[in-house]
Every structure is written in C-alpha cells, then in structure tokens.
C-alpha cells in the first residue's frame, strides 16, 4: 500500500490524470500519450495571453514555443519559471519549474539554447496494510533540451531541439508486473518562424510560426506492447503588433495546437453467449504514420485555441498587462479558462506573473499562478 502524506496512493493516479489536462491518464500513461508535462506552458508571459506563444516568442522560452524564433534574438538571456502545479490538490510538493538559456553566437551563425523542465509529483509513503510505514519515494518527470536556430533568410528563421526525457512515477513495482514505474526516451522538435519585411502596413509587425514538437520513440514503463507515444504536438502561431508607438504598444496573438497521436480502442472478442473471451491492448500508430492518421480522428475537433492581447507602456518597454482565453472542445478535454498577467522590465531584468481562472468550477488547474524571472544582456 502506498500513501502520500497520509493519503492513499491512488491520489497519484488522480494527479497524473489531470496533469496538463490533456486527456485522462493512468499511472503509467495509458491515456492519449505519455509524459503530458511536456505540453505545460513554461512561462508566465505566454500563459497570461491564453497560452499563446508560437509566434510572439522573443525571449528564452522560445525554446518551447518556437525554437526558430531564437534566430531573431540578439545577446544572451536566462529565465526561470516556477508554478505550484494543480493548486486544487493543495500539495505543496507538487510543482513545476522551467529553466532556460539562450545565446546568439555570430561565429556559428545562429543561436544556441538549453532548457530544463522539472515536474515534481510529490513524496509518497510506502506502507503495509496495517499501515506501517516502510519508506518513501518521490515521483517526478524531467526533460533536458538543447537547441539551435538560424536565419535561412532575412525574414525566415529555422530551429531544432534535441531532448532527453525521464519519467519516474514510482521507483517500485506498483502494478506487480515486474517493472518499476520509470521510463526514458528522447525526442526532437523542428520549427520555422516567418517575419515578413514587406507587407505594407504589416511590415515588421506580423509573425507566423510553426512548431512540430516531441517527435521520438515511445515511453516504455511495463513492456514494449504497452508502450505509449510521446505527446507529438503541432502548433501554428500568429502574432501581430496592432498598435506601435513610442510609449504604447499592443500585441495580439493566437495559437492553434493539435496533438498528433492516433490511438485505437481495444478489440473485444466475445463467445457465442456474449461473454468476453479476450480484450486486446489499445493500438497506437507509430511515427511518422501518426502525423497523418491523427487527422482521421475528429480532425479539427481536437484543435485547441489560445488567444490573447498584451499592452506595453514605456520607452523602452517598462510595464505590461495581459489577458487571454484558452479553449478546448468539451468532448476532448474541455479545458476553458481565462488568463491574466502582468510584467515589468528594468535594465537587464524582467519579471512576469500570470493567473489562470478556469471557467469550470473546481477545475484542478483553476487559480494556477506562474512566476518568471529573467535576465537579458548584450541586446
């Protein structure tokens, strides 16, 4: 028997079921995909605009939203984001951290980046049935990413990321199947960002980004037959600077994202009397087939939409206010929330925070706060 700070081990099942609220997940990721933590918005700025950052990615967090955007950024920057994750569970040791760094290097003709994503699932107590404590373990998930971006043309940036993923849900054989709840994999991202230089009134005001992320082999917790795909995700982002003046600037952003995972339901074999003879494991398409077959499963109904607006005051930019909205089809996750945010910039320092207000009452993501600190120099 396993307990987390006095609560039954089944709590971790619930936590994993709503992490990132992608789709229901069981302990060993028997839902739409494994490691959904890779889809969590990693910075307060984009989160304050409805989790839309695919085109307005002009800081170190671009390594997540669109690594190609790093090709347009001079100098160096380091940023750190922290969030107490799923505050409805009131677990102080359930948190999310994201550390990122970028450096534009003229001698290699582009920008290098590195980031670390860490999700703590908390500490759990191993007990006997009486229950006598036998020990503890901590569940966590980790990703380490390195990237490179360069300009193919003056108005077109290209980027790539390479990533190592480690998931340690339980370093013990919870399901008594001879395997621990631990798995690792690798993945890569490819991205492009277009910033047109000659579009009349939209010159230097429009950005269009495309990012295909988390391409890689499946995660295997139990055995190869039960392996689950990574959350391969396609993101299209559009950003426009709708007001541009010396002291007042307004940005509008919208992102469309689609999980490119195709899972088929289990096949049930029945006898002549209608009794169940066997149930097969769900079938999942491998890459690259899933990049295309996923669209055969409610093609556009599974597209999520995030949109927002950002107002900056100051010359240079000093104070920002942000507002956004995120929508997901009720049949495929039903995430609907408003987001609010603010930020300040002074010299090389910056601070952003965001607040998520879920439309659905008592949603696990409701009242989520993110805080981001950043330092940028050599601009």
Can you say where each PLM-predicted feature lies in the sequence?
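N-terminal secretory signal peptides that target proteins for export/translocation
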Residues: 1-9
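Nuclease and nuclease-like effector domains acting on nucleic acids or nucleotide cofactors
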Residues: 6, 15, 237
């Amino acid at each position: 028997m396993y307990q987390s700070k006095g609560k039954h081990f089944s709590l971790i099942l619930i936590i994993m079921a709503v992490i990132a609220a992608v789709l229901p997940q069981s302990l060993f990721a028997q839902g739409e995909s494994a490691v959904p933590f890779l889809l969590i918005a990693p910075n307060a700025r984009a989160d304050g605009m409805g989790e839309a950052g695919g085109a307005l990615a002009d800081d170190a967090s671009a390594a997540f939203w669109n690594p190609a955007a790093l090709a347009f950024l001079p100098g160096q920057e380091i940023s750190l984001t922290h969030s107490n994750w799923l505050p409805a569970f009131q677990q102080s040791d359930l948190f999310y951290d994201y550390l990122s760094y970028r450096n534009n290097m003229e001698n290699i003709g582009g920008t290098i980046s590195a980031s670390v994503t860490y999700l703590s699932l908390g500490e759990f107590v191993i007990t006997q049935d009486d229950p006598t404590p036998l020990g503890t373990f901590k569940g966590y998930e980790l990703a380490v990413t390195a990237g490179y971006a360069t300009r193919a043309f003056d108005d077109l940036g290209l980027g790539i990321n390479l990533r190592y993923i480690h998931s340690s849900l339980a370093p013990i054989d919870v399901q008594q199947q001879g395997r621990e709840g631990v798995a690792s994999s690798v993945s890569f991202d490819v991205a492009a960002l277009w910033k047109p230089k000659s579009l009349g009134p939209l010159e230097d005001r429009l950005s269009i980004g495309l990012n295909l992320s988390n391409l890689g082999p499946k995660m295997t917790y139990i055995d190869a037959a039960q392996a689950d795909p990574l959350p391969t995700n396609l993101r299209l982002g559009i950003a426009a600077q709708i007001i541009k003046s010396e002291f007042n600037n307004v940005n509008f952003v919208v992102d469309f994202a689609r999980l490119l995972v195709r899972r088929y339901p289990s096949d049930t074999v029945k006898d002549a009397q209608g009794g169940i003879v066997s149930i097969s494991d769900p079938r999942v398409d491998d890459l690259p087939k899933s990049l295309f077959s996923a669209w055969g499963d409610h093609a556009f109904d599974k597209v999520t939409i995030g949109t927002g607006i950002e107002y900056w005051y100051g010359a240079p930019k000093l104070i920002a206010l942000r507002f956004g909205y995120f929508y997901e089809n009720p049949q495929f996750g039903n995430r609907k929330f408003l987001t609010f945010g603010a930020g300040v910039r002074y010299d090389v320092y910056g601070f952003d925070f965001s607040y998520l207000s879920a439309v659905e009452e008592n949603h696990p993501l409701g009242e989520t706060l993110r805080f981001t600190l950043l330092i940028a120099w050599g601009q």
